Amino acid sequence: MSPSGNDPGRAGPAPRFAVVGNPENRRITLFADAVRAAGLPAPRVVPWVAVLRSDGADFPADEIVRLDSPGENPEVDRLLRDAQDPTRVEGSARWYARFTRATRGLRGGVRLDDPDELAVLFDKRRCHATLAAADVPVPWSPTSGAAAEPVRGWDDVRALMRRHRMPRLFVKLAHGSSASGVLAVESSADGRIRATTSVELAPEGALFNSLKVRRYERERDIAAIVDALAPDGLHLERWLPKASLRGRVTDLRIVVVAGRATHAVVRTSSSPLTNLHLGGSRGDLDAVRDAVRAAGGRWTDVLALCERAAACFPHTLCVGVDLLPAIGWRRFAVGEVNAFGDLLPRLTGLPGSGAEGLGTYAAQIAAVLRRTGLGGGLGPPNPSYRPHDAHDVYDAHHQHQQQHRTGTTHASA
């Protein structure tokens, strides 16, 4: 196909894409490469900096508009949360307010997402409530939904732990991602407490995102971290003991495109935090499927659960579902649903998914072409779907910044 995208085999004019993102980021490069590989004109790139400074952007009615992560750009981070140091944790509530306002300021075009759904996806409390209302299994939470009591600090966390008999729980920033501001908290019968987190507590009380997972065992340190995070909003979840592979705790990131589970990555870790940029490792998808079958389950049911979670956001083309397998591999729960959870370079689609041989971006383009009647794309979920092999190659992309500190990234695995 010519670079102009004019193809006599097409039923009409080639679709034109625009992507809102950070032009220097490899997310944009990978998406643009996938668009060109489909024989389409290169997408128009609209920088987040321009959107935030202009309080919006305009798109022609026939331009297909994709939003990508605003993370990993210090100037965008400053505009979203007034952060002079991108490695600081604080300011996620301000980030959320400005980001959701910016998404509502995008005018025209054919959106591949929905501002209302994005507002839910980036609020863990609302997302949890949405999933629970749809009977999608999730870890129990006392902060689920808009009517939940606010958590004003560590004293409230301690009170909720006692009231709901939660000796182990996860404390999360309501608007955080990439494990920023997440604490895995454990208490013992004798009153001792510890927290595992990537948060670095500086002597003056400032909080920094770190690439090093730390363990705090002094309650005053844990209280200081939680008290500093609380003004941005907190979400609490009962700790679901996860299954393991080869002695390492395990979970999965499943990408769902146009209603179909298309890509899967297994994440394993020696700590409660499995994020790959925090020392987690890729796991063996075949071993996961074998474990599910050995427990009497069906892999197709596992994928169907992720599709049910994605169906809660019908106007968002693609989401990344974090799936938590319970010990024994018989039960699963959805930990989170990520709007920008598709950065999985060189990973091709699951056999039988309709995305075989396609990366996550190419699968989305195929789905758009199908919707516009200009390509085969992805069909409806196949009830006989029996994946048997997927070479999950994940290139951990986070670079060390300021030695072992890292800025916000938003919804990477």
Feature annotation, model-predicted:
Residues 22-34, 38-159:
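Conserved N-proximal alpha/beta basic substrate-recognition cap immediately N-terminal to
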Residues 83-93, 194-208, 277-288:
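A solvent-exposed, charged loop/short amphipathic helix patch at secondary-structure junctions
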Residues 171, 182-185, 192-198, 250-268, ...:
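Beta-strand scaffold of nucleotide-dependent catalytic cores
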Residues 216-329:
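A long amphipathic alpha-helix within ATP-dependent nucleotide-binding catalytic cores
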Residues 279-318, 325-413:
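C-terminal active-site "lid" helix and adjoining low-complexity regulatory extension at the edge
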